[in-house]
Protein backbone atom coordinates (compact mmCIF):
# COMPACT_ATOMS: atom_id res chain seq x y z
CA UNK A 1 0.00 0.00 0.00
CA UNK A 2 1.34 3.44 -0.95
CA UNK A 3 0.82 6.30 1.51
CA UNK A 4 0.32 9.76 0.01
CA UNK A 5 2.96 12.09 1.43
CA UNK A 6 2.82 15.87 1.82
CA UNK A 7 5.46 17.81 -0.09
CA UNK A 8 7.12 19.00 3.12
CA UNK A 9 7.88 15.36 4.00
CA UNK A 10 10.43 15.40 1.18
CA UNK A 11 12.45 18.63 1.53
CA UNK A 12 15.08 19.44 -1.08
CA UNK A 13 18.40 17.97 0.11
CA UNK A 14 20.37 20.86 -1.40
CA UNK A 15 20.35 23.43 -4.19
CA UNK A 16 19.19 22.41 -7.64
CA UNK A 17 16.44 20.25 -9.06
CA UNK A 18 16.52 16.64 -7.83
CA UNK A 19 15.10 13.64 -9.70
CA UNK A 20 14.24 10.34 -8.06
CA UNK A 21 15.69 7.13 -9.51
CA UNK A 22 12.36 5.35 -9.16
CA UNK A 23 12.91 2.94 -12.05
CA UNK A 24 15.97 1.51 -10.30
CA UNK A 25 14.85 1.89 -6.69
CA UNK A 26 11.09 1.71 -6.09
CA UNK A 27 11.69 1.18 -2.35
CA UNK A 28 13.69 2.96 0.34
CA UNK A 29 17.35 1.92 0.38
CA UNK A 30 19.40 0.05 2.97
CA UNK A 31 22.07 1.97 4.87
CA UNK A 32 24.97 0.20 3.15
CA UNK A 33 23.57 0.77 -0.33
CA UNK A 34 23.10 4.46 0.40
CA UNK A 35 26.80 4.71 1.31
CA UNK A 36 27.87 2.68 -1.72
CA UNK A 37 25.95 4.77 -4.24
CA UNK A 38 27.03 8.09 -2.74
CA UNK A 39 30.71 7.07 -2.74
CA UNK A 40 30.85 5.70 -6.31
CA UNK A 41 28.33 7.54 -8.49
CA UNK A 42 29.74 11.11 -8.30
CA UNK A 43 33.41 10.19 -9.01
CA UNK A 44 32.47 7.62 -11.67
CA UNK A 45 30.19 10.02 -13.51
CA UNK A 46 32.72 12.87 -13.20
CA UNK A 47 35.32 10.70 -14.92
CA UNK A 48 33.29 10.04 -18.05
CA UNK A 49 31.80 13.53 -18.22
CA UNK A 50 35.28 15.04 -18.32
CA UNK A 51 36.49 12.44 -20.82
CA UNK A 52 33.66 12.97 -23.30
CA UNK A 53 32.93 16.67 -22.90
CA UNK A 54 29.61 16.67 -21.03
CA UNK A 55 28.51 20.13 -19.85
CA UNK A 56 28.33 19.10 -16.19
CA UNK A 57 30.90 18.26 -13.56
CA UNK A 58 29.13 15.18 -12.23
CA UNK A 59 25.89 13.96 -10.65
CA UNK A 60 25.30 14.69 -6.98
CA UNK A 61 23.47 12.09 -4.90
CA UNK A 62 21.18 12.51 -1.89
CA UNK A 63 18.79 10.32 0.07
CA UNK A 64 15.48 11.71 1.32
CA UNK A 65 13.35 9.45 3.53
CA UNK A 66 15.33 6.51 2.19
CA UNK A 67 14.69 7.34 -1.49
CA UNK A 68 17.55 8.17 -3.86
CA UNK A 69 17.64 11.47 -5.75
CA UNK A 70 20.21 12.85 -8.19
CA UNK A 71 21.00 16.27 -9.64
CA UNK A 72 23.61 17.45 -12.16
CA UNK A 73 26.39 19.68 -10.86
CA UNK A 74 26.93 22.52 -13.35
CA UNK A 75 30.33 23.07 -14.90
CA UNK A 76 30.28 26.70 -13.80
CA UNK A 77 27.88 29.04 -12.06
CA UNK A 78 25.38 28.49 -9.23
CA UNK A 79 24.02 25.06 -8.33
CA UNK A 80 20.45 26.32 -8.63
CA UNK A 81 18.85 28.54 -11.23
CA UNK A 82 15.14 29.28 -11.51
CA UNK A 83 15.31 29.95 -15.23
CA UNK A 84 17.47 29.11 -18.20
CA UNK A 85 20.45 31.47 -18.58
CA UNK A 86 20.31 34.02 -21.42
CA UNK A 87 21.45 32.69 -24.77
CA UNK A 88 24.05 35.45 -25.23
CA UNK A 89 25.61 34.66 -21.86
CA UNK A 90 25.79 30.94 -22.66
CA UNK A 91 27.33 31.69 -26.07
CA UNK A 92 30.05 33.87 -24.53
CA UNK A 93 30.73 31.70 -21.48
CA UNK A 94 31.08 28.50 -23.52
CA UNK A 95 33.72 30.11 -25.74
CA UNK A 96 35.71 32.03 -23.12
CA UNK A 97 35.56 30.04 -19.88
CA UNK A 98 38.54 27.62 -19.63
CA UNK A 99 36.39 24.75 -18.30
CA UNK A 100 33.96 25.04 -21.22
CA UNK A 101 36.82 25.27 -23.72
CA UNK A 102 38.33 22.06 -22.32
CA UNK A 103 34.96 20.29 -22.53
CA UNK A 104 34.50 21.48 -26.12
CA UNK A 105 37.87 19.99 -27.08
CA UNK A 106 36.95 16.72 -25.34
CA UNK A 107 33.54 16.59 -27.06
CA UNK A 108 35.07 17.29 -30.48
CA UNK A 109 37.66 14.55 -29.97
CA UNK A 110 35.03 12.05 -28.79
CA UNK A 111 32.76 12.66 -31.77
CA UNK A 112 35.69 12.28 -34.17
CA UNK A 113 37.32 9.18 -32.64
CA UNK A 114 34.22 7.52 -31.10
CA UNK A 115 36.35 6.02 -28.29
CA UNK A 116 33.41 4.06 -26.88
CA UNK A 117 34.04 1.51 -29.63
CA UNK A 118 37.52 0.71 -28.32
CA UNK A 119 36.23 0.64 -24.73
CA UNK A 120 33.49 -1.82 -25.69
CA UNK A 121 35.92 -4.03 -27.61
CA UNK A 122 38.30 -4.01 -24.63
CA UNK A 123 35.46 -4.92 -22.30
CA UNK A 124 34.42 -8.00 -24.28
CA UNK A 125 37.95 -9.17 -25.12
CA UNK A 126 39.86 -8.38 -21.92
CA UNK A 127 38.15 -6.57 -19.06
CA UNK A 128 35.09 -8.79 -18.83
CA UNK A 129 37.19 -11.88 -18.13
CA UNK A 130 39.25 -9.98 -15.56
CA UNK A 131 36.11 -9.03 -13.64
CA UNK A 132 34.76 -12.56 -13.85
CA UNK A 133 38.02 -13.86 -12.35
CA UNK A 134 37.85 -11.33 -9.52
CA UNK A 135 34.24 -12.23 -8.77
CA UNK A 136 34.92 -15.96 -8.92
CA UNK A 137 37.83 -15.67 -6.47
CA UNK A 138 35.53 -14.05 -3.91
CA UNK A 139 32.66 -16.45 -4.68
CA UNK A 140 34.92 -19.46 -4.07
CA UNK A 141 35.21 -18.47 -0.41
CA UNK A 142 32.23 -19.95 1.42
CA UNK A 143 31.35 -17.48 4.20
CA UNK A 144 29.20 -20.05 5.98
CA UNK A 145 32.33 -21.92 7.06
CA UNK A 146 34.25 -18.92 8.45
CA UNK A 147 34.72 -17.89 12.05
CA UNK A 148 33.94 -14.32 13.08
CA UNK A 149 37.43 -12.93 12.40
CA UNK A 150 37.78 -14.50 8.97
CA UNK A 151 34.20 -13.54 8.10
CA UNK A 152 35.04 -9.92 8.92
CA UNK A 153 37.97 -10.14 6.48
CA UNK A 154 35.71 -11.68 3.84
CA UNK A 155 33.15 -8.91 4.30
CA UNK A 156 35.90 -6.35 3.70
CA UNK A 157 36.95 -8.22 0.54
CA UNK A 158 33.35 -8.24 -0.72
CA UNK A 159 33.04 -4.54 0.04
CA UNK A 160 36.22 -3.72 -1.90
CA UNK A 161 34.92 -5.73 -4.86
CA UNK A 162 31.52 -4.03 -4.81
CA UNK A 163 33.00 -0.55 -4.49
CA UNK A 164 35.44 -0.99 -7.37
CA UNK A 165 32.72 -2.64 -9.47
CA UNK A 166 30.20 0.15 -8.97
CA UNK A 167 32.82 2.80 -9.68
CA UNK A 168 33.70 1.08 -12.95
CA UNK A 169 30.02 0.72 -13.84
CA UNK A 170 29.50 4.47 -13.54
CA UNK A 171 32.70 5.23 -15.47
CA UNK A 172 31.37 3.07 -18.32
CA UNK A 173 28.17 5.13 -18.64
CA UNK A 174 30.00 7.32 -21.12
CA UNK A 175 30.41 4.24 -23.29
CA UNK A 176 27.15 2.36 -22.66
CA UNK A 177 24.69 5.30 -22.59
CA UNK A 178 26.08 8.24 -24.56
CA UNK A 179 26.01 6.39 -27.93
CA UNK A 180 22.33 5.59 -27.33
CA UNK A 181 21.71 9.23 -26.53
CA UNK A 182 23.55 10.28 -29.70
CA UNK A 183 21.30 8.09 -31.83
CA UNK A 184 18.17 9.54 -30.25
CA UNK A 185 19.45 13.13 -30.38
CA UNK A 186 20.45 12.99 -34.05
CA UNK A 187 17.21 11.25 -34.99
CA UNK A 188 15.28 14.02 -33.28
CA UNK A 189 17.19 16.55 -35.39
CA UNK A 190 16.10 14.56 -38.46
CA UNK A 191 12.47 14.56 -37.32
CA UNK A 192 12.37 10.97 -36.03
CA UNK A 193 10.48 10.42 -32.77
CA UNK A 194 12.59 8.97 -29.92
CA UNK A 195 10.20 6.03 -29.50
CA UNK A 196 10.72 5.07 -33.13
CA UNK A 197 14.47 5.66 -32.97
CA UNK A 198 14.85 3.42 -29.93
CA UNK A 199 13.16 0.62 -31.87
CA UNK A 200 16.44 0.22 -33.77
CA UNK A 201 17.93 -1.23 -30.56
CA UNK A 202 15.70 -4.32 -30.57
CA UNK A 203 17.92 -7.39 -30.45
CA UNK A 204 20.95 -5.49 -29.17
CA UNK A 205 20.82 -6.80 -25.61
CA UNK A 206 23.14 -9.73 -25.05
CA UNK A 207 21.33 -12.70 -23.54
CA UNK A 208 23.91 -14.52 -21.39
CA UNK A 209 24.21 -18.27 -21.53
CA UNK A 210 23.15 -19.96 -18.31
CA UNK A 211 26.74 -21.16 -17.80
CA UNK A 212 27.87 -17.52 -17.59
CA UNK A 213 25.43 -16.61 -14.84
CA UNK A 214 26.48 -16.93 -11.22
CA UNK A 215 23.76 -18.08 -8.88
CA UNK A 216 24.91 -15.34 -6.53
CA UNK A 217 23.98 -12.48 -8.86
CA UNK A 218 21.32 -10.18 -7.41
CA UNK A 219 18.29 -10.46 -9.64
CA UNK A 220 15.13 -9.03 -8.06
CA UNK A 221 16.66 -5.56 -7.76
CA UNK A 222 19.84 -3.66 -6.97
CA UNK A 223 19.81 -3.28 -3.18
CA UNK A 224 21.01 -5.72 -0.54
CA UNK A 225 17.47 -6.68 0.47
CA UNK A 226 16.94 -8.17 -3.01
CA UNK A 227 17.32 -11.86 -3.86
CA UNK A 228 19.92 -13.77 -5.86
CA UNK A 229 19.25 -16.48 -8.43
CA UNK A 230 20.22 -19.11 -5.84
CA UNK A 231 17.59 -17.79 -3.45
CA UNK A 232 14.98 -17.92 -6.20
CA UNK A 233 15.92 -21.52 -6.95
CA UNK A 234 17.39 -21.43 -10.49
CA UNK A 235 18.66 -19.25 -13.33
CA UNK A 236 16.08 -20.34 -15.89
CA UNK A 237 14.67 -16.86 -16.25
CA UNK A 238 17.94 -15.13 -17.05
CA UNK A 239 17.64 -15.21 -20.85
CA UNK A 240 14.88 -13.46 -22.76
CA UNK A 241 13.67 -15.95 -25.41
CA UNK A 242 12.34 -13.33 -27.79
CA UNK A 243 12.41 -12.78 -31.53
CA UNK A 244 12.97 -9.04 -31.81
CA UNK A 245 12.63 -7.15 -35.07
CA UNK A 246 14.68 -3.94 -35.03
CA UNK A 247 13.19 -0.93 -36.77
CA UNK A 248 14.92 0.04 -40.02
CA UNK A 249 15.25 3.79 -39.60
CA UNK A 250 16.50 4.44 -43.13
CA UNK A 251 12.97 4.88 -44.46
CA UNK A 252 12.47 7.71 -41.95
CA UNK A 253 15.74 9.54 -42.64
CA UNK A 254 16.89 11.30 -45.79
CA UNK A 255 19.39 9.34 -47.90
CA UNK A 256 22.17 11.88 -47.36
CA UNK A 257 22.22 10.90 -43.66
CA UNK A 258 22.14 7.12 -44.12
CA UNK A 259 25.90 6.63 -43.69
CA UNK A 260 25.90 8.54 -40.39
CA UNK A 261 22.72 6.74 -39.32
CA UNK A 262 24.36 3.35 -39.86
CA UNK A 263 27.27 4.36 -37.61
CA UNK A 264 24.94 5.71 -34.93
CA UNK A 265 22.79 2.56 -34.88
CA UNK A 266 25.82 0.26 -34.76
CA UNK A 267 27.37 2.24 -31.91
CA UNK A 268 24.10 2.39 -29.95
CA UNK A 269 23.51 -1.36 -30.30
CA UNK A 270 27.01 -2.13 -29.05
CA UNK A 271 26.48 0.31 -26.19
CA UNK A 272 23.25 -1.43 -25.17
CA UNK A 273 25.08 -4.76 -25.19
CA UNK A 274 27.87 -3.30 -23.04
CA UNK A 275 25.42 -1.80 -20.56
CA UNK A 276 23.53 -5.02 -19.94
CA UNK A 277 26.70 -7.10 -19.70
CA UNK A 278 28.80 -4.90 -17.45
CA UNK A 279 25.87 -4.16 -15.15
CA UNK A 280 25.58 -7.85 -14.31
CA UNK A 281 29.31 -8.41 -13.86
CA UNK A 282 30.40 -5.21 -12.08
CA UNK A 283 27.17 -4.71 -10.15
CA UNK A 284 24.74 -7.59 -9.68
CA UNK A 285 27.34 -10.31 -9.10
CA UNK A 286 29.54 -8.46 -6.55
CA UNK A 287 26.41 -7.22 -4.77
CA UNK A 288 25.05 -10.75 -4.53
CA UNK A 289 28.34 -11.89 -3.00
CA UNK A 290 28.17 -9.07 -0.46
CA UNK A 291 24.59 -10.04 0.41
CA UNK A 292 25.71 -13.65 0.91
CA UNK A 293 28.47 -12.52 3.29
CA UNK A 294 26.13 -10.21 5.20
CA UNK A 295 23.61 -13.02 5.67
CA UNK A 296 26.43 -15.23 6.98
CA UNK A 297 27.21 -12.47 9.48
CA UNK A 298 23.53 -12.46 10.36
CA UNK A 299 23.69 -16.19 11.08
CA UNK A 300 26.36 -15.47 13.72
CA UNK A 301 25.02 -12.20 15.11
CA UNK A 302 21.22 -12.54 14.94
CA UNK A 303 20.48 -16.22 14.16
CA UNK A 304 16.75 -15.81 14.82
CA UNK A 305 16.54 -13.50 11.78
CA UNK A 306 19.78 -13.34 9.75
CA UNK A 307 18.23 -11.01 7.16
CA UNK A 308 18.43 -8.19 9.72
CA UNK A 309 22.13 -8.00 8.83
CA UNK A 310 21.38 -6.21 5.54
CA UNK A 311 20.11 -3.25 7.59
CA UNK A 312 23.67 -2.68 8.87
CA UNK A 313 26.64 -1.21 7.03
CA UNK A 314 29.67 -3.37 6.36
CA UNK A 315 31.72 -1.35 8.85
CA UNK A 316 29.08 -1.93 11.53
CA UNK A 317 29.04 -5.68 10.90
CA UNK A 318 32.84 -5.84 10.99
CA UNK A 319 32.82 -4.02 14.34
CA UNK A 320 30.37 -6.53 15.76
CA UNK A 321 32.26 -9.52 14.38
CA UNK A 322 35.61 -8.30 15.75
CA UNK A 323 34.20 -7.59 19.20
CA UNK A 324 34.25 -3.80 18.98
CA UNK A 325 30.52 -3.65 19.65
CA UNK A 326 28.06 -1.23 18.16
CA UNK A 327 24.60 -2.02 16.83
CA UNK A 328 21.99 -4.04 18.67
CA UNK A 329 19.31 -6.23 17.17
CA UNK A 330 16.76 -3.69 18.43
CA UNK A 331 18.39 -0.98 16.31
CA UNK A 332 18.52 -3.22 13.23
CA UNK A 333 14.86 -4.04 13.65
CA UNK A 334 14.06 -0.33 14.03
CA UNK A 335 15.92 0.41 10.78
CA UNK A 336 13.99 -2.25 8.94
CA UNK A 337 10.64 -0.96 10.18
CA UNK A 338 11.61 2.59 9.25
CA UNK A 339 12.74 1.50 5.78
CA UNK A 340 9.49 -0.36 5.18
CA UNK A 341 7.51 2.68 6.32
CA UNK A 342 9.54 4.96 4.03
CA UNK A 343 9.06 2.50 1.17
CA UNK A 344 5.29 2.86 1.51
CA UNK A 345 5.49 6.64 1.05
CA UNK A 346 4.56 8.13 -2.30
CA UNK A 347 7.96 9.73 -2.85
CA UNK A 348 7.76 12.58 -5.39
CA UNK A 349 9.52 12.07 -8.73
CA UNK A 350 11.24 15.44 -8.38
CA UNK A 351 12.17 17.83 -5.57
CA UNK A 352 13.13 21.47 -5.92
CA UNK A 353 12.90 23.70 -8.99
CA UNK A 354 12.74 22.28 -12.48
CA UNK A 355 16.20 21.89 -13.99
CA UNK A 356 17.12 25.00 -15.98
CA UNK A 357 18.64 23.60 -19.18
CA UNK A 358 20.80 26.14 -21.03
CA UNK A 359 19.96 26.73 -24.71
CA UNK A 360 22.02 24.04 -26.43
CA UNK A 361 22.09 25.88 -29.74
CA UNK A 362 24.18 28.60 -28.08
CA UNK A 363 26.98 26.11 -27.38
CA UNK A 364 29.72 25.12 -29.83
CA UNK A 365 28.34 22.30 -31.99
CA UNK A 366 30.41 19.43 -30.43
CA UNK A 367 29.42 20.51 -26.93
CA UNK A 368 25.78 20.93 -27.95
CA UNK A 369 25.58 17.47 -29.53
CA UNK A 370 27.18 15.70 -26.56
CA UNK A 371 24.87 17.72 -24.30
CA UNK A 372 21.82 16.66 -26.29
CA UNK A 373 23.00 13.04 -26.15
CA UNK A 374 23.47 13.20 -22.38
CA UNK A 375 19.99 14.68 -21.89
CA UNK A 376 18.41 12.12 -24.22
CA UNK A 377 20.08 9.20 -22.45
CA UNK A 378 19.07 10.48 -19.01
CA UNK A 379 15.51 11.41 -19.96
CA UNK A 380 14.80 8.14 -21.73
CA UNK A 381 16.36 6.02 -18.98
CA UNK A 382 14.37 7.59 -16.15
CA UNK A 383 11.36 8.87 -18.06
CA UNK A 384 9.94 12.36 -17.70
CA UNK A 385 6.63 11.60 -16.01
CA UNK A 386 4.85 10.98 -19.31
CA UNK A 387 4.19 7.40 -20.50
CA UNK A 388 5.85 6.09 -23.65
CA UNK A 389 4.80 3.18 -25.83
CA UNK A 390 6.80 0.21 -27.09
CA UNK A 391 5.49 -1.66 -30.13
CA UNK A 392 2.85 -1.01 -32.77
CA UNK A 393 -0.06 -3.32 -31.85
CA UNK A 394 -2.73 -2.89 -29.18
CA UNK A 395 -3.37 -5.74 -26.75
CA UNK A 396 -6.38 -6.51 -24.56
CA UNK A 397 -6.13 -8.89 -21.63
CA UNK A 398 -6.46 -9.46 -17.90
CA UNK A 399 -4.44 -7.09 -15.71
CA UNK A 400 -2.12 -8.46 -13.04
CA UNK A 401 -0.97 -5.65 -10.74
CA UNK A 402 1.99 -6.90 -8.72
CA UNK A 403 5.25 -5.50 -7.33
CA UNK A 404 7.15 -8.73 -6.64
CA UNK A 405 8.23 -11.15 -9.40
CA UNK A 406 8.09 -14.13 -7.05
CA UNK A 407 4.46 -13.30 -6.23
CA UNK A 408 3.77 -12.74 -9.92
CA UNK A 409 4.94 -16.25 -10.78
CA UNK A 410 2.20 -17.72 -8.57
CA UNK A 411 -0.61 -15.38 -9.68
CA UNK A 412 0.28 -15.09 -13.37
CA UNK A 413 -1.79 -16.55 -16.21
CA UNK A 414 -0.33 -16.69 -19.74
CA UNK A 415 -1.42 -13.66 -21.72
CA UNK A 416 -1.82 -11.40 -18.67
CA UNK A 417 -1.01 -7.70 -18.85
CA UNK A 418 1.69 -7.35 -16.19
CA UNK A 419 1.43 -4.03 -14.32
CA UNK A 420 4.28 -3.14 -11.96
CA UNK A 421 6.46 -0.26 -10.79
CA UNK A 422 9.63 -1.41 -12.55
CA UNK A 423 11.24 -4.61 -13.80
CA UNK A 424 14.52 -6.46 -13.34
CA UNK A 425 15.90 -9.71 -14.86
CA UNK A 426 13.86 -11.79 -12.42
CA UNK A 427 10.71 -10.76 -14.31
CA UNK A 428 11.90 -12.38 -17.55
CA UNK A 429 10.24 -15.76 -16.95
CA UNK A 430 6.85 -14.10 -16.41
CA UNK A 431 7.23 -11.54 -19.20
CA UNK A 432 8.15 -14.22 -21.74
CA UNK A 433 4.54 -15.40 -21.53
CA UNK A 434 2.84 -12.03 -20.93
CA UNK A 435 0.53 -10.36 -23.39
CA UNK A 436 1.75 -6.86 -22.56
CA UNK A 437 3.66 -4.87 -19.95
CA UNK A 438 2.85 -1.65 -18.10
CA UNK A 439 5.23 0.07 -15.67
CA UNK A 440 4.86 3.12 -13.46
CA UNK A 441 8.46 4.26 -13.96
CA UNK A 442 11.16 4.26 -16.61
CA UNK A 443 11.69 5.49 -20.14
CA UNK A 444 12.56 4.26 -23.62
CA UNK A 445 15.91 2.74 -22.62
CA UNK A 446 14.91 1.37 -19.20
CA UNK A 447 15.10 -2.36 -18.46
CA UNK A 448 11.34 -2.71 -18.96
CA UNK A 449 11.43 -1.04 -22.38
CA UNK A 450 14.42 -3.09 -23.53
CA UNK A 451 12.78 -6.34 -22.40
CA UNK A 452 9.49 -5.50 -24.14
CA UNK A 453 11.38 -4.90 -27.40
CA UNK A 454 13.34 -8.13 -27.06
CA UNK A 455 10.14 -10.11 -26.46
CA UNK A 456 8.11 -8.27 -29.06
CA UNK A 457 5.28 -7.50 -26.62
CA UNK A 458 3.43 -4.15 -26.51
CA UNK A 459 4.19 -2.00 -23.50
CA UNK A 460 3.42 1.34 -21.92
CA UNK A 461 6.39 2.48 -19.85
CA UNK A 462 6.41 5.21 -17.20
CA UNK A 463 2.68 5.63 -16.50
CA UNK A 464 2.90 7.05 -12.95
CA UNK A 465 -0.72 6.24 -12.07
CA UNK A 466 -0.80 2.69 -13.45
CA UNK A 467 -0.30 0.75 -10.22
CA UNK A 468 -2.93 2.83 -8.40
CA UNK A 469 -5.44 3.12 -11.23
CA UNK A 470 -5.50 -0.44 -12.60
CA UNK A 471 -6.84 -3.48 -10.75
CA UNK A 472 -5.93 -7.14 -10.93
CA UNK A 473 -8.58 -9.07 -12.83
CA UNK A 474 -9.83 -6.09 -14.83
CA UNK A 475 -9.76 -6.30 -18.62
CA UNK A 476 -7.48 -3.60 -19.99
CA UNK A 477 -6.30 -2.47 -23.41
CA UNK A 478 -2.66 -1.47 -23.83
CA UNK A 479 -2.18 0.96 -26.71
CA UNK A 480 1.55 1.57 -27.35
CA UNK A 481 0.91 4.00 -30.20
CA UNK A 482 -0.91 6.45 -27.93
CA UNK A 483 0.89 5.25 -24.77
CA UNK A 484 -2.38 4.62 -22.95
CA UNK A 485 -3.83 1.84 -20.79
CA UNK A 486 -7.62 1.78 -20.51
CA UNK A 487 -9.86 -0.43 -18.37
CA UNK A 488 -12.74 -1.72 -20.47
CA UNK A 489 -16.10 -0.67 -19.11
CA UNK A 490 -14.83 2.51 -17.46
Indicate residue ranges for each PLM-predicted region.
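Short, flexible coil/turn micro-motifs enriched in small/turn-prone residues
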Residues: 61, 216, 384-386, 392, ...
Amino acid sequence: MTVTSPTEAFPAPGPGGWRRLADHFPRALTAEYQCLYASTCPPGMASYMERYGVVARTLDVAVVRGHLYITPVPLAGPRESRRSPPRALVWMLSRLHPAFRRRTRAARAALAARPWRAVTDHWFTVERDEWRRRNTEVENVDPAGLDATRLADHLRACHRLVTSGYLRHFELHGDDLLPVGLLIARCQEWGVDPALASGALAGASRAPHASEVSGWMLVTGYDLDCLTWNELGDTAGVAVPGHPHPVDLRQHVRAEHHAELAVLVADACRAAELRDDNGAITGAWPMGLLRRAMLAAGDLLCPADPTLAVEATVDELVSLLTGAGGLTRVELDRRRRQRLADSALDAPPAIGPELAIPPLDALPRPLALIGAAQLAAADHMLGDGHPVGIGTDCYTGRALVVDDPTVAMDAFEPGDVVVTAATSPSWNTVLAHAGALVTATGGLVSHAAITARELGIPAVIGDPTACRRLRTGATVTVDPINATVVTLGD
